[in-house]
A protein has these predicted regions:
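Acidic, metal/ion-coordinating pockets
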Residues: 8-303
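N-terminal export signals
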Residues: 1-7
């Protein structure tokens, strides 16, 4: 999904800078199209049109189209980029998916539970590259050596025994136009219950902290670093009663799921929440549910 953000400029600068924020989630290494479609509004008020969707070619084309609309954009994945993948990716330890994302030039991926399927050491290899073997499969079967992700994995609530995060908690991206500059801060994290979903050995020595507490603490730090807009990419999700029409229903009707208690505790400094995990599609103004939480809530379904 994509949305437009407007950031204020300084004195004598343009009143705002238009920024396109492109978010997706739960790709699960689906490089080949799954022969699925999405239903979107047609030319007439009652018309619905089925568009082919899924697979890396459709995703890359959609992202390129959205990027072309404005010189200012950011692309963020809300987790499960890899893991539980079809053989075309999993046979090669999901290196093909990472390399595809490098070609698309995404900016950040918030880790999800499936990023830990092969253990945290293999996750670090996907980020940093190299051919060290941590699994039964051989790494670097395609690219030798494997260079790793050219985008940042974010894991704000995944802590080592010394209290340091396994991967960076946040990232910043700055946009300038004329004399104006807008800084967007990104927080990325997985769901706290990740250890119950993966092999214990794969997360040994790690602690998964509370999502809302972590997001609020990081939001304060990002504001101190000069962030004008804060985006939370959270691999946790829910659903709305809008169902399949969630991408065109702006009111967040009947929100449910494990993400809701987290949303209710988020600091108002957070402007956008890109969610995932439940493979549901919704783009809505959460202020319609709770006026004290006026952020945009999105999830792009799945591959």
């Amino acid at each position: 999904g994509a949305l437009a953000l407007a950031g204020c400029g300084g004195v004598g600068a343009p009143q705002h800078i238009d920024i396109t924020l492109i978010g997706f989630n739960d790709l699960h290494g689906n490089l080949e199209p799954p022969r699925q479609s999405i239903t979107v509004p047609g030319a007439l008020p009652t018309e619905r049109v089925a568009l082919p969707a899924g697979g890396i070619a459709h995703l890359a084309g959609a992202i390129a189209t959205l990027k072309a609309r404005t010189p200012h954009h950011a692309v963020v994945s809300a987790g499960d980029l890899v893991g539980a993948s079809p053989m075309v990716s999993s046979l090669f330890l999901d290196e093909p998916t990472i390399e595809a994302m490098n070609q698309i030039q995404i900016d950040f991926n918030a880790v999800g539970n499936h990023e830990f399927d092969r253990g945290w050491r293999e996750l670090l290899r996907l980020q940093h590259g190299g051919c060290e073997k941590f699994t039964v499969r051989e790494p670097c079967q395609i690219s030798q050596p494997f260079a790793g992700a050219q985008f940042g994995f974010l894991a704000a609530n995944v802590l080592r025994e010394d209290g340091q995060t396994l991967l960076p908690a946040t990232g910043l991206k700055r946009f300038t136009e004329g004399g104006a500059q807008v800084t967007v801060g990104f927080i990325g994290m997985t769901l706290r219950s990740t250890p119950s979903m993966v092999t214990p050995a794969g997360v040994a020595g790690l602690r998964f902290a509370d999502e809302a507490d972590t997001a609020n603490a990081q939001a304060a730090q990002l504001r101190a670093q000069g962030a004008d807009i804060i985006v939370l990419a959270l691999h946790e999700g829910g659903a709305t009663t809008a169902g399949a029409t969630g991408i065109t229903e702006p009111s967040c009707t009947g929100p449910s799921g494990d993400i809701v208690p987290i949303l209710e505790r988020l600091d108002t400094a957070i402007d956008v929440v890109i969610s995932g995990h439940t493979h549901q599609a919704y783009v809505c103004d959460y202020a319609s549910v709770n006026p004290q939480r006026p952020f945009l809530l999105t999830s792009a379904g799945q591959y």
